[in-house]
Each structure stands twice: as C-alpha cells, then as structure tokens.
C-alpha cells in the first residue's frame, strides 16, 4: 500500500493481538537511508547503530500505546514486552544461519530488499513462525531495485496462490490529507 495506509501499524497491532501464540515479536527493516544517502559511521553497539532505522517501528508502537490510558494494562504491555525482550529488533545483516521458531517476524520496508535477501529471510522460518513483510513498491530507496525487481514484488509474484501465503494491499491513506495529496500528485 501507499504511504500512510497503516501497513506497519496494522502489522504491529496484529502481532500484539497474537502475542500469546508466540514467544517473541522480532522487528527488522533494511538499513537503507532515504534516497540511499547515509549519514556515515554511527557509534555504539549493533542495537545503537540500527535504532535510527528502527525508529518508525518504535513510533508505531508508541502510537498503539497512546490509544490506552497510562494506567491501563494494554498501555503497560508494550513496555513489559520490550523489557522482557519479547519485542526485539534484529539487524537483517545477522539473520543468516538463524532458525526462527515460535516468533512473529515483521520486516518493514521490504521493497528495499533484493529477491535473494527476501528468500534468505523467509528460509529462516522454523516451526510456528509467522513472517510479515510490509512495503510499498513505489517507495524504493535502494538504487539498483525498481517496482519489478525488488524482494517484495518477487515474493508477491512467486507465492501468490500458495497455501501458507497471504497478500493484502492497503489503498486508503490514513496518515493525513497532506500525505494523501502527496501520494496522488507528487
């Protein structure tokens, strides 16, 4: 779906709703800056380096949290899940060799991945693993990918009609009228 349709928000809300069926919710995004213009070296450990790229995921979790009063259990659950590493981030650079069982794995901005990278990610799925790819093929920041050659389009094309696969396209922008105007005219 286009920018502002709620792709990431709905993936996170769905994962939180199903959290009791899984041991962990893992969040990831490709480390690709807007227009592939990086800020350069970032200090810190792996988590500190990827946190700026993960901020949209944290922003969406914060938005979900804001829908409940601070004293409500649903508000506190997100903080508790993060503290217990039940919601965690995973740099995609370290995914090879892992076997992900009993997890929901959300990969945001999957249009910035290559078909090979998407295959590598999906083949990490162990038993009781749900993988959710979100993205918009019109928002590609990786210079050598386009609407047809990116990993998200590849998955949609290759897995359409398979039993373990589902694809949803969100069409109505919900972020703001300005975001909708930009989607339609820019």
Which residue ranges define each predicted feature?
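Conserved helicase motor core of SF1/SF2 NTP-dependent helicases
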Residues: 1-104, 112-186
């Amino acid at each position: 779906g286009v920018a502002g349709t709620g792709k990431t928000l709905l993936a996170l809300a769905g994962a939180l709703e199903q959290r009791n069926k899984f041991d962990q919710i893992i969040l990831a995004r490709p480390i690709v800056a807007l227009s592939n213009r990086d800020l350069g070296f970032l200090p810190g450990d792996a988590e500190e380096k990827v946190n700026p790229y993960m901020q949209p995921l944290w922003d969406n979790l914060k938005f979900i949290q804001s829908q409940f009063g601070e004293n409500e259990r649903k508000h506190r659950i997100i903080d508790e899940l993060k503290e217990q590493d039940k919601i965690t981030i995973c740099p995609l650079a370290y995914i090879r060799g892992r076997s992900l069982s009993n997890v929901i794995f959300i990969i945001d901005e999957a249009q910035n991945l290559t078909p090979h990278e998407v295959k590598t990610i999906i083949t990490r799925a162990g038993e009781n693993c749900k993988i959710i790819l979100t993205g918009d093929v019109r928002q590609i920041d990786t210079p050598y990918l386009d609407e047809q050659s990116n990993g998200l389009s590849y998955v949609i094309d290759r897995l359409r009609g398979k039993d373990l696969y589902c694809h949803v396209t969100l069409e109505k922008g919900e972020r703001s009228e300005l975001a909708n105007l930009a989607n339609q005219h820019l």
